[in-house]
Amino acid sequence: MTPQHHLPADIERTSLSIITAELDAMGLTPPPETAAVVKRVIHTTADFDYARNLRFTPGAVAAGVAALQGAAPIVTDTNMALSGITKPGLTRLGDTALCYMADPEVAALAKANGTTRAVASMQRAAAEHPGAILAVGNAPTALLTIADLIETAGLRPALVIGVPVGFVNVVESKERLFAVCAAHGVPAIVAMGRKGGSNVAAAICNALVYSAAGMLDPTDRGWK
């Protein structure tokens, strides 16, 4: 097979067509309401397992889109996830994304309380942006903090994206978060199991931003 040069917009369209065809062939066609998120994650990772392990509370995608259209900010647990979120999409929506992990006040709070920056950053996010979209791609402790705040402090974020990757406390934290969100009516998108990562968190955010901003086709995002 001879490699060919393709324009970015054509690459994305062709990739998504391949993803759609392969999902259909495997009997894993996602429901229309979650398809954009599932396909965006597979496009980012080339991993079709996400068609099986991404779980959504009822109406989670619609809640995320509505929140972004209402200017709810996105708060991530890593600067890597933050850097992967589409800036043109956020600009079109008049929206913002932020991460507190490198904030000196968060570092000081974590040290004073003998906890992690991930915990302190989510505590600050809950205090300053209680209606935000919280996107976690790295730290299980961030998910556990969010779950605790939902249960004990009445936190009601617009959406929780829980996709940390790893082997220690990852599966358990995701299961707890999903159960707590489902029990308290908090919209959630969670990658069950060990897989995930900051790139997956950013991909889910981008799928929501593109939908909210009407940028579903690559040319809508300025690609040629």
Outline where the language-model segments fall.
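Charged, compositionally biased N-terminal leader segments and the immediate start
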Residues: 1-31
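A short, well-structured juxtamembrane/interface segment
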Residues: 52-67
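Buried hydrophobic positions in well-ordered alpha/beta secondary-structure cores of metabolic enzymes
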Residues: 77, 161-162, 204
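Short glycine/serine/threonine-rich phosphate/pyrophosphate-binding segments
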Residues: 81-84, 141-146, 167-171, 197-201
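Long, charge-dense
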Residues: 90-129
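ADP-ribose/adenylate-binding Rossmann-like module
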Residues: 158-167
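C-terminal functional extensions of proteins
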Residues: 168-224
